[in-house]
């Protein structure tokens, strides 16, 4: 179905391009025979083609107060939407903001040169939504490094997996600190994360 729309848009673009180029060529090749045949100079042409777009008085519908008040009464009978359902249908802006912050934090982590810089960046994350978004971003990488990892892995099991992995010591320590912070964010359940590594 979408390929038909794409084809339709491509054909419409091609046709409009050909029509425009043809119109440009035909306009450039046609020139008025004398100055009176030009539209700008031919005042009679302009006078004869003026149109009145105003609505005639008898074409307007008469204003009816009874009909207007009946419509207002009908509006008063309308049922208002349930605010709880409306709130559930709206996006969670805190989570969206958390993803934005997590993207910035991931960029900082990628550009950090030393272990201390990375540790300071991870310790600087105080928002639970940001920590959760960071974890979701790095989850595929974590599964590549630790194939036995899944969502039910405890901190002790993860500690054993990290120790037995072939990561260097700085990366092992950083991974443990980050996972402790993530686990603390799940336990905290508040908007701010004050768990020390």
From Swiss-Prot:
A motif (RxLR-dEER) lies at residues 44-60. Belongs to the RxLR effector family. Effector that is involved in host plant infection. Triggers cell death strongly in Nicotiana benthamiana leaves. This is RxLR effector protein PITG_08174. GO terms for cellular component: extracellular region; host cell cytoplasm. It is found in: Secreted; Host cytoplasm. Keywords: Host cytoplasm, Secreted, Signal. The RxLR-dEER motif acts to carry the protein into the host cell cytoplasm through binding to cell surface phosphatidylinositol-3-phosphate. Induction: Expression is induced during host plant infection. Residues 1-22 form the signal peptide.
